[in-house]
Structure formats: structure tokens, C-alpha cells
Amino acid sequence: MATAKKSTAKKASAKKTAAKKPAASARAAKTDATVLLQRDHADVKKLFRQYEKLADNEADGQERQALAMQICQMLTVHATIEEEIFYPAAREAEVEEDLLDEAEVEHASAKDLIAQIQAMSPDEELYDAKVTVLGEYVDHHVQEEENEMFPKCRRAEMDLAGLAERLAERKSELMAEEAA
């Protein structure tokens, strides 16, 4: 009985502290966090398609490497803003824990592959294969986020417009750090 009360109190407390949705008209005027993240997904998918064309045409190693590094940077920044801002907000709003746990494990796998790619020369064996597999990891991750996690986040009491602002600000900071 005491644990049931604690559990109920914990859920009530989490719901009180979770950022609330603004009015529908205010939401429409601003970008939603899931839309911002989906734009990142579309941008990186486009880069992977460009990389595939370069690899298929046996393009110069430097050109492939430059594009691979751009992909790695974009994914690193994207994963960071999700892990620092979006996932904690989703956890606070009590979005399905298993989805969030799996997303973080997928990020860890992608980061490992990113580190391998960044440490390689484009002329090394398996370079193109590693970039391709990274793209496959990302496709899987994106499908789960966009088809499962994001709809649940939209139904949860999350301030997606406020999160979008925080995500965009942090993304700008990280991109500036990378450029420096």
C-alpha cells in the first residue's frame, strides 16, 4: 500500500514538473521539437544518399571523407541535443521508458561507428561499408523515433515549442564549437 502511494505521488510530481503544452494557436506559430528533429533526420538522410552516389561512382577519397565527416558531425550534434534536452524531457513527461532506453543504446552504437570512421582513411578497407552501416543504423533509429516515439511525445504533456527553441539554441552552440 505504501509503495502504491509513493508510485502515485511520484507520477503526480513528474506530471506537475513536466513542461505543459501551450495553447494550440501558440503551438502553430512555433516549430515543434519533433519537427526540428525530423528536419535533421531528413538532412542527414540526404547526405547519406549523396555519399552512396559518391561511393558507387568510386569518387575521390578526399571527397568521400569530407562528406563522411559532415555526416559524423551532424549526427554527433543531433545525438547530443537529443540526449541533453529531448530525451530527459520525454522521460519527465513519462514517455515510454523502453523507447528512450533503446534510443540511447542506438546512439551509443552510432557513436562507436562514428569514432571508427573518423579515425580511418577513406582508402582503408571497410571505410565505405562503415559509412553505409552507419546510415542503416540511422534509418532504423529514425523510423523508431518518427513512428513510435514522436507520436507519444506529441500526446504527452510536453512543451514541444519550448523544447524546439532549446534544441535549436544548443545545436547552434555545438555547431559553433565544431567550427572553432
What do these predicted ranges mean?
Residues 2-180:
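Small-residue-biased structural context
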